[in-house]
Regions:
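Membrane-embedded translocation segments of transport machinery
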Residues: 155, 159-303, 327-328
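Transmembrane helix-boundary motif of multi-pass solute transporters/channels
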Residues: 1-37, 218-224, 234-238, 242-245, ...
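A generic transmembrane alpha-helix motif of multi-pass inner-membrane proteins
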Residues: 359-384, 402-431
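Select transmembrane alpha-helical segments in multipass membrane proteins
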Residues: 1-5, 29-33, 71-84, 133-136, ...
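Inter-helical loop and helix-membrane interface segments of multi-pass membrane transporters/permeases
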Residues: 20-25, 58-78, 91-151, 180-203, ...
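Extracellular loop-to-transmembrane helix junctions
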Residues: 22-48, 130, 247, 369, ...
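Membrane-interface "cap" regions at the ends of multi-pass membrane proteins
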Residues: 1-16, 43-67, 73-77, 228-232, ...
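Helix-loop-helix connectors at the membrane interface of multi-pass transporters/channels
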Residues: 62, 94-126, 226-230, 235, ...
């Protein structure tokens, strides 16, 4: 499980999305609430989801039916649809990582001109053939891993490449922090400015908490179903939350000081990391090799996370319709490709096609991170804390078991405090 957590933690969520959201939502007024939410609410909901999967021993729909009865099955369907939507836009970013890896291999990974940075990213994201082609390649690789059951091989490789990516991040952070003007980036990330706080920044921090931990759609529930009997779930969940939170902070430290050092726009949007990293590589000895290694590891990290998400939908088709894993993976991937096609075009031909100010990519991200993932975890909390609590507590009572008082506090957080907080932030963020 720790290997799973490491590949989820040090991936696109930390390196791509967290710096973008931090830059677009006021820096510290997003970062600090995220850390608090992740270590509290995130831990509670992650523990609930993994434990329910451990108890249910099946896909999210199977688990909901087995533990709660037929009236809980629609919640499982919500998770399946959420997984499809997440992978639809996530695969666009996965395609970008492959494209930047190809550029690095061809010796085009170093850029010092701001104009060239924007032009290169625009040429990739705005070209329909490139954007859709790389996305399709990324999804094909993902489907191949799931269909061919080579996930164990991927996890073994994770033991090498994920620590390698972590080390590369540390090197890039050190170099970025030595750049003139980098201190402005640190101040932006960690200096609390009350006047900059908005409910929207808290709303986005809540959404990223769910996104970064992959909770609310059944992804971690599916992985929980694979845990052997007697697993120490609480310890694993604490490690997952700790690693994920730390990786996100490191991702911001890797990007934001360089953004301010080179006078880039911190609110540049989803492409922020991709227009920043080539500048940092250009400041390093053997920068071209660093670029290849970084984007190779990042591509692998993106792939392992996408395998987790596709596994969710594949497991649903296998359990509910008794198809083979190969058939389930192919069907899921084709559906994702159809939706993902429009997500990929959201930075090119469909960039100006918007509804309420959002394009297709934005809507898929918004509906999942800020709506369906929080709602999914509210349902998980009610199921765990009210319907199956005695068995839920038993599953967590692996020696050394927590005290009775700990369980009382945990249950209070699970069914009262955390749901109330989620509802308040959801309502205020949507208004």
């Amino acid at each position: 499980m720790v290997v799973v957590s490491l590949k989820e933690a040090v991936g696109l969520g930390a390196i791509w999305k967290f710096p973008w959201l931090a830059g677009s939502n006021g820096g510290a007024v997003f970062v600090i609430p995220y850390v608090i939410l992740s270590l509290t609410l995130g831990f509670v909901f992650l523990t609930a989801e993994i434990t329910l999967g451990y108890m249910g021993r099946g896909s999210i729909v199977t688990t909901m039916r087995k533990l709660g009865g037929s009236k809980w099955v629609p919640a499982g369907y919500l998770g399946v649809v959420t997984g499809l939507l997440v992978l639809s836009f996530y695969s666009v970013i996965g395609g970008w990582t492959i494209a930047y890896l190809v550029d690095a291999i061809l010796g085009r990974g170093l850029v010092t001109s701001q104009a060239e940075l924007g032009a290169r990213f625009g040429a990739l994201s705005g070209d329909p053939l490139l954007a859709v082609g790389y996305q399709a390649l990324f999804l094909t690789l993902t489907a191949g891993v799931v269909a061919l059951k080579v996930s164990k091989g991927i996890e073994r490789l994770s033991r090498i490449l994920m620590p390698a990516l972590f080390i590369l991040m540390l090197i890039l952070i050190v170099r970025g922090l030595t750049l003139p003007g980098a201190s402005e980036g640190l101040s932006y990330l960690f200096a609390w400015k009350p006047e900059a706080f908005t409910w929207q920044s808290l709303y986005q921090a809540l959404g990223f908490t769910f996104f970064s931990l992959c909770v609310g759609c059944g992804c971690m529930m599916t992985y929980g179903s694979y845990l052997p009997q007697g697993s120490r779930i609480l310890k694993s969940c604490a490690q997952i939350v700790g690693l994920t939170t730390a990786a996100s902070i490191l991702g911001a430290l890797m990007v934001m000081p360089a953004v301010f050092a080179f006078h880039l726009d911190p609110a540049a949007g989803p492409g922020l990391t991709f227009v920043t990293m080539p500048v940092i590589f250009a400041q390093l000895p053997f920068g071209g090799l660093f670029a290849v290694a970084f984007f190779a590891c990042l591509t692998f990290a993106a792939l392992t996370s996408s395998v987790s998400m596709l596994e969710l939908d594949t497991a649903f088709l296998v359990d509910e319709f008794h198809v083979s894993r190969t058939t389930g993976a192919i069907i899921s991937t084709l559906v994702i490709m159809v939706i993902g096609f429009f997500c990929a075009l959201s930075f090119g031909p469909l960039a100006d096609t918007k509804f309420l100010g959002k394009n297709v990519f934005d809507w898929c991200d918004f509906l999942t991170s800020n709506i369906s993932l929080p709602i999914g975890d509210l349902i998980v909390a009610l199921l765990a804390g009210l319907v199956v609590w005695p068995k839920f507590r038993e599953a967590l009572s692996v020696p050394p078991a927590p005290s009775d008082q700990w369980f009382r506090i945990f249950r209070l957080l699970l069914v009262v405090a955390c749901p109330i907080l989620v509802v308040i932030v959801l309502v205020t963020g949507l208004l």
